[in-house]
Structures are given as structure tokens and as C-alpha cells.
Amino acid sequence: MKFSLKSLLTIAAAASTLILAGCGEKAVDNNKVKIGVMAGAEAQVAEVAAKVAKEKYNLDVELVTFTDYVTPNAALDDGSIDANAFQHKPYLDKQIADRGYKLAIVGNTFVYPIAGYSKQIKSVDELQDGARIAVPNDPTNLGRSLLLLQQQGLLKLREDVGLLATVRDIVENPKKLEILELDAAQLPRSLDDVALSIINTTYASSINLTPEKDGIFVENKESPYVNILVAREANVNAENVQNFKKAYQTDEVAKAASEIFQGGAVKGW
């Protein structure tokens, strides 16, 4: 079988295109998108966004649920999902610094304020000396919790500590409180064993607690911890990802989040 020079050049060009395509992002179907979310109430909010995306952009959204804070970014990094919606910027920045992920912010979702919850006390004034307080153990939410405890006058952190405070940064602890660092998912169960637990709204909602109704004290809603939609740097501007963002940032989704979280979700866009 003979090939003309023109045919050979055409074949070579096609082969080169296939090789180059294999080195970057996979071919994108802009009518489909796979989004990672936390199981529970956040997934319910995302389901509303998925419905809006289908109605407004003919976008088929597959939601992939997670129960921890580590796996969603790993799944995004390896291409298992197209984007995720579960974290705030300080957490993302820490993950990028620690793991080298090439991830980027697509847009804001909601502020889910953390709060102090208890089965033993009704105000911080009732905390006994040596009381045990449970806080999240991931670096950003640990710092977030310690700053909240400082705002309540329960301890003092060293000056200019920033957002990533640790227990080593505590310089005053007049009640000699014992700070227990636990996985965030374990915090709701810790309420039976500690005087006070600082819990993210996502996990608090799993046991029907809301900041406004049940929190002894609540984080300021003007915090830097607005949650974000995140994609890879390579697909952050992809049509399917951008259309999901536009579907998420709608009044329909904001209304649903307010109802699902009983006022514990504040629109971040």
C-alpha cells in the first residue's frame, strides 16, 4: 500500500494532536460536570444547584459525596471530579502549600459559621476550671476555633498569630481549659464527653443543630471563611464549570440553603 507525502503529513499531524491532547486535560463534554460535595445538608443544597443548572444551561450535574475534608481535593487533583464545593480559602491555601495541588477558585458559595455547642452549659460563664473543649484538628479550622475562643475571652493567643493558630500560640488560659483536637466529623459525638465543642455548620446540621438556634456563641458572619467552588487551574474557566457556578449563585439556591440550614448559611456572592 502506497501513501502520498500529503497523506503521510496528514497522519503525522493527527497523531501529534492525539499525543498533545493526552498530555493535558481530557476532552471536555460541556453538557456534563462532576462536582464533589460533603454528604448531608451541603449535598442537598448542591442538588438544587444541579436542578437549576439543568433548567438554565442544559447541564447534567453528577454529585459525588464525601464525608471528610481530605479526599475531595485529592479527587479533584487526580481528575476524578471536575470541581468541588466544600472548603474555604484558608483551607485551600494550606492544602496547596502542603500538597502542591494546582487548584483555583471558581467562585464563592456560602459562609457556614462555626459555633460553640454544649449539652452541659448554656453560657461561657458556666465553664468550670479545667473544662474540656473539643475543636477541629485540621490546621485552618483549628485556628478558626481558637480565634473564636479568644473572641469569647476564654483564652489569649500571641499577637499577630494570623489564621493558622495552634495550641502552642495560647499565651493565656485563665481557666486552664483542656483543648482536645478531634477530626471534624467526630465533633458532634464529642458533645456527650466534653463541656463545649466547636463544630462546623455542616457537621452540626447532621445532628439538627444550627448556629443561631443552638449555638452558645457564633462566629462573626463577616469572617474570611466563605466557602468556595474550586476547580483545577486547567479547567477553572471551562464552560461546564462556569455554568455550574452561575447555577449555584442564584436566588433559588440561596433560598434553599437558608431553609436547609435554618438560617445557618449566609450567601457569599
Swiss-Prot record:
User: What residues form the membrane-spanning segments?
Assistant: none
Classification via InterPro entries: Lipoprotein_NlpA (IPR004872)
Question: What UniProt keywords apply to this chain's record, in alphabetical order?
Answer: Amino-acid transport, Cell membrane, Lipoprotein, Membrane, Palmitate, Signal, Transport
Signal peptide positions are 1-22
Keyword Metal-binding found: no
| Any one Gene Ontology cellular component term annotated for this protein | plasma membrane
CDD domains linked: PBP2_lipoprotein_IlpA_like
Residue runs in coiled coils: none
Lipid addition sites, N-palmitoyl cysteine: 23
Q: What are the BP-aspect GO terms?
A: D-methionine transmembrane transport; methionine import across plasma membrane
Membrane topology value: Lipid-anchor
Could you tell me which residues are lipidated, with the kind given as S-diacylglycerol cysteine? 23
User: What role is this protein assigned?
Assistant: This protein is a component of a D-methionine permease, a binding protein-dependent, ATP-driven transport system.
Q: Which family does it belong to?
A: Belongs to the NlpA lipoprotein family.
Q: What is this protein's name?
A: Probable D-methionine-binding lipoprotein MetQ
Where does this protein come from, organism-wise?
Vibrio cholerae serotype O1 (strain ATCC 39315 / El Tor Inaba N16961)
Q: Which gene encodes it?
A: metQ
